[in-house]
């Protein structure tokens, strides 16, 4: 749609018509995690007391008791208008790849480490969440990536990613050879441990660890970050989000490779395969408490210095 991210600030609404905005709320969390289970239990009780219909993802529903309504993620996407993800960014990414196709609003409660995508505190979420449910929130749309593996002109595997798609060796780290094309224009051949193709959302994740730049979420851009390239002159490059990235794996690679989507989904790649990575038509509808500031998040999570005066 040509839009990577935008922010809207709806006016607040009264408690009497609060449920008109969100009526059915889904709860998703990290399975078998004590802190997550405690937060999910509190959320389920608190939301039910407020009169919302609450659906719990099947993987965590058993730990909340037999009387909860449970569905899998696909069913939740069809029935919920808001999903609350309890956990870290990894849990958010897993849910987002599914829920993005349904235009479900998603907000996170942080039970992980950094939590770039999870805004709400786990111990006192009630005040902030109450304001969100009454309409005091900001909406961001984050685009996803679509990765396809082509073999002899046919698609053998595909999936989507919120953060990044990564070409890399299978189980043993070693150097691989491949060519990189941008919109069918040859850019370079590469000998490296792999290639990261990241969205702005993913630029604070694996891409950042590999030396990539941080892209603000509203940028319509992708960043390509080589992993340990065998040349001193190779640097990350930022391209337009409308670009199609093609990685052609050299037939001389002796081992099977993989494309990982957000580190969760793995697509098998053989020597000679072509990987196409482009912006997906699906977008994650991420909501934040009112007053959300991206640079405040960066300062907090990355330990940047505060204002001097």
UniProtKB/Swiss-Prot annotation:
Disulfide bonds: none annotated. GO terms for cellular component: cytoplasm. It holds the Pfam family NAD_kinase. It is found in: Cytoplasm. Keywords: ATP-binding, Cytoplasm, Kinase, NAD, NADP, Nucleotide-binding, Transferase. Its EC number is 2.7.1.23. Involved in the regulation of the intracellular balance of NAD and NADP, and is a key enzyme in the biosynthesis of NADP. Catalyzes specifically the phosphorylation on 2'-hydroxyl of the adenosine moiety of NAD to yield NADP. PANTHER family: NAD KINASE. Belongs to the NAD kinase family. This is NAD kinase.
